[in-house]
Amino acid sequence: ITASKVLEIALTGRDCGQEERAPMCGVPYHAVDGYISKLIENGYKAAICEQLEDPALAKGIVKRDVIRVITPGTIIDQAMLDEKTNNYLCCIYLDKGFGMSYVDISTGELHVTENISLNDFLKNSTNDLLIEEINKIAPSEIISNKLTGNEPVDSMINLSEGLSLDECKEIVLKHFKLVSLDSLGLKDNFHAVTSLGMLLNYLNETQKTSLDHINKLHFYKVGEYLQLDGSTRKNLELIETIRGKKGPGTLYHVIDNTMTAMGGRLLKKWIEEPLKNIKHINLRLDAVEELYKNVMASNNIKECLRSVYDIERLISRIVYGSCNGRDMNSLKQSLSNLPDLKAELSGLSSELFAEIYSKFDELKDIFDIIDKAIVEEPPVSIKEGGILKTGYDDELDELKEITVNGKNWISGLQTKERDATGIKNLKIGFNKVFGYYLEVTKSYLKDVPEYYIRKQTLANCERYVTPELKEMEAKILNADEQIMKLEYELFLEIRQFISSQVKSIQETAYNIAVVDTINSLAIAAVKNNYVRPEMNSKGYMSITDGRHPVIEKIMKNEMFVPNDTYIDNREYRMSIITGPNMAGKSTYMRQVALIALL
């Protein structure tokens, strides 16, 4: 009833005995993704139920079960996701502080943090930190053992019974195949472990499949990055404008020259989590400067990345078991660019690029198996054959030869029967209900030989079979059935092989994202005539001819007037800015903040 209203489809019903009628509604299977997306957008969950056994082999009613529950935070279908935005599922554990874990199951990215309040005086500030962390990651779904007291956040929370610490430890260790929490860096972080255990338990209950792509945990401390509260992020218009729109008018739009979805997501993360460590800042700046000065290398890298698909989300679909041959070819196409990209990296000398080059895996074995196995234009379905190339498997080739020879024989039978019967318009056809048949129009029925067996009568023709046609049909259909079964089994083997390499693929995908993001910043610097800052820890900031990076791009017919800034932590701790309304006071302040972030 609810689905029919939300999806705007007809509500029907079926008698189910005792004068009751079961309400029903349905959608075409091939178009189900669009309807599921609409349900999720309206705040509902969708349970996917499938047959668990072959109907031909089942005894009695075919066994069915829920194989997955799709929720706002567990979407993996790329059509339902923004390619350059993470889709986080967040889990919070509240008890004298908080533990927070969040995951993007479409990429395998997993983060964990915690903050403990030792007394009531710190309780409010701890809660504020939690709300700021939640606002920063902007999750699609939140699970928590308690409400936070913040109305916008609480409206998103699904309350869940908290698990015990021991239960959560067991879940975490089982997932990561470990015997101790030490190697995860969570030895004494009980709030973090509890939130992580609750998160993984929720995923196990809803996804009911392998989560092997979620294999790397990033534990961080709140405050490890520069803290930007919600008001600051909103007013600086980092990712969205004040009106909540993406695109022009944001810092992200000005500096986003990424060529891949992975790079686009990482750039957003870097903007929202500014570094505080000068060494790490200079490491990035060294790499940006190298590409800024080497425009040819920058352009070559850009071209290498142009046809790279979203490897992070592709490998997640493969591990999930929801990929098809087209996903495999998208991965192959992406990997085909890696040798050229690695060659470009070999000519770069900055420490960050040297480190990436030293561990850059071209994943040649994965490229080779896909290239050898998958046809150039595979079908969407993986259970109906037509996926694998000739030459990949000997047994499969033999079966294909049977069908080819059989179909050639059937084509020859048409000519043979026309000559034998004199029926000039006799033709051979096929459908899934009646199989192969000989079709004769009404005007030639008098010429039909006795050995023809009537199969079907239509308005203008009769359809027949012959013993030899039935025999060949059985051979072809049997071979076709075996081909579909064998191709499916071989495809699963290929999928399993690629899934076993998930860590290497994810590491390469991350390295590609870093290169893409660094190159994006270098391109932005060239386009906008930015200069490299000199970082110091002496407590002062000096800006000469500073410009607001966003407003100068919006101004079409006017030139932004650059201005200077100097502040320190001694004599010039404060500047008083005066002027009439709309004179640019807030623009100047935001300009300084954005330059500091850049």
Regions found by a protein language model. Give the residues of each.
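Extended, charged coiled-coil "arm/hinge" scaffolds of SMC/Rad50-like chromosome-maintenance ATPases
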Residues: L458, E462-Q496
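Extended, charged helical/alpha-beta scaffold domains that provide interaction surfaces
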Residues: S411, R418-K442, P449
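Charged, surface-exposed helical/loop "interaction arms" that form contiguous linear patches used
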Residues: Y320, S334-N337, T390-G391, E417-N425, ...
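Short beta-strand motif preference
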Residues: F98-Y102, L438, I543
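Charged catalytic and DNA/RNA-contacting regions of genome-maintenance
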Residues: I1-E290, N299, E303-V319, C323-T415
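Cytosolic, long alpha-helical scaffolding segments
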Residues: I366, A373, V380, Y436-Y452
